[in-house]
Curated annotation (Swiss-Prot):
Its main location: membrane. The keyword DNA repair does not apply. Residues 22-127, 131-215 form the Ig-like domain. One of its GO terms (cellular component) is external side of plasma membrane. Residues 1-21 form the signal peptide. The ITSMs (immunoreceptor tyrosine-based switch motifs) with the consensus sequence T-X-Y-X-X-[VI] present in SLAM family receptors have overlapping specificity for activating and inhibitory SH2 domain-containing binding partners. Especially they mediate the interaction with the SH2 domain of SH2D1A and SH2D1B. A 'three-pronged' mechanism is proposed involving threonine (position -2), phosphorylated tyrosine (position 0) and valine/isoleucine (position +3). This is Natural killer cell receptor 2B4. The keyword Ribosomal protein does not apply. InterPro entries: CD2/SLAM_rcpt (IPR015631), Ig-like_dom (IPR007110), Ig-like_dom_sf (IPR036179), Ig-like_fold (IPR013783), NK_rcpt_2B4_Ig_dom (IPR024303).
Length: 370
């Protein structure tokens, strides 16, 4: 109702002010708010030197310059940025017309010769009774892996001005949901299926849509899910390997300890250097474990002169059993202990002696090996 009143007032003003600035009949232009509006004059058959677009302001009882243009220069906009000038056809463009843009517009074209031509437009901008144009929706979503090769998809679709709008959901090209107020979608799909979703928002005059592909989310989750069994297998094999290695090390250590306990001790070798026949000492050598033995080396330097090079040396070997009688030299009483006695002498004709009849002094001249 208010728009009709404004229109009637403008028509009356047009009759009053017509002829005071712009001559001729006015072209009527009707538009709705929120859409671009272009005022284009008929073809001008003269060489243009300058132009001026003006709008009638009833409050000021005259015309107000919107923009000016001279040949070879840029347009000079004396109004706001909602107006622009198209040089090619001398048109005035209102980017988004509003109700306050209604009124009388006049175009003055000045030729090079100074002749002025005019064109008049009566503009009526009405508020649309229909909803505004739908904006592009904001579609967000994510995929989550589930058991048995399933993927859970969660989506949300919103617009800034959602009054009197309807929502429709598509998976690929298939319509899956037609509920008008359903801004959220939650469903389970197969991992190997289609994961491209489209949200369509519409009202009686326009519609917009937004598409989102969640294939990568579901595939990445599926690959992560398939990786877990391999990871578990690797961990189990590593644990088995480490356990086997630890058992082997323990078994080897116990085996070495057992071998060290059962293995016989090494033989003990005693070296004795006797330089003086008068030196007397008791030789004690005891076998501490069965089956063992010891070797006694006695280096004896006799007081007699060493054999000369003319006298050949002979070696006497005798196998004796040590006496059980205690004496100055103690021996092992084990039956398995045997002694080998040999003597290096410098006699020309060695004479074997009975080891059993040798005196202690004579026995000291022998080397004993066991």
């Amino acid at each position: 109702m208010l728009g009709q009143v404004v229109t009637l007032i403008l028509l009356l003003l047009l009759k009053v002010y017509q002829g005071k600035g712009c001559q001729g009949s006015a072209d009527h232009v009707v538009s709705i708010s929120g859409v671009p509006l272009q005022l284009q004059p008929n073809s001008i058959q003269t060489k243009v030197d300058s132009i001026a677009w003006k709008k009638l302001l009833p409050s000021q009882n005259g015309f107000h310059h919107i923009l000016k243009w001279e040949n070879g220069s840029l347009p000079s906009n004396t109004s706001n940025d909602r107006f622009s000038f198209i040089v090619k056809n001398l048109s005035l463009l209102i980017k988004a017309a509003q109700q306050q843009d209604s009124g009388l517009y006049c175009l003055e074209v000045t030729s090079i010769s100074g002749k002025v031509q005019t064109a008049t437009f009566q503009v009526f901008v009405f508020e649309s009774l229909l909803p505004d144009k739908v904006e592009k929706p904001r579609l967000q979503g994510q995929g989550k892996i589930l058991d048995r090769g399933r993927c859970q998809v969660a989506l949300s679709c919103l617009v800034s001005r959602d009054g009197n709008v309807s929502y429709a959901w598509y998976r690929g090209s298939k319509l899956i949901q037609t509920a008008g107020n359903l801004t959220y979608l939650d469903e389970e799909v197969d991992i190997n299926g289609t994961h491209t979703y489209t949200c369509n928002v519409s009202n009686p005059v326009s519609w917009e849509s937004h598409t989102l592909n969640l294939t990568q989310d579901c595939q990445n989750a599926h690959q992560e899910f398939r990786f877990w069994p391999f990871l578990v297998i690797i961990v189990i094999l590593s644990a088995l390997f480490l356990g086997t290695l630890a058992c082997f090390c323990v078994w080897r250590r116990k085996r070495k300890e057992k071998q060290s306990e059962t293995s016989p001790k090494e033989f003990l070798t005693i070296y004795e250097d006797v330089k003086d026949l008068k030196t007397r000492r008791n030789h004690e050598q005891e076998q501490t474990f069965p089956g063992g033995g010891s070797t006694i080396y006695s280096m004896i330097q006799s007081q007699s002169s060493a054999p000369t090079s003319q006298e050949p040396a002979y070696t006497l070997y005798s196998l004796i059993q040590p006496s059980r009688k205690s004496g100055s030299r103690k021996r092992n009483h084990s039956p398995s202990f045997n002694s080998t006695i040999y003597e290096v002498i410098g006699k020309s004709q060695p004479k074997a002696q009975n080891p059993a009849r040798l005196s202690r002094k004579e026995l000291e001249n022998f080397d004993v090996y066991s």
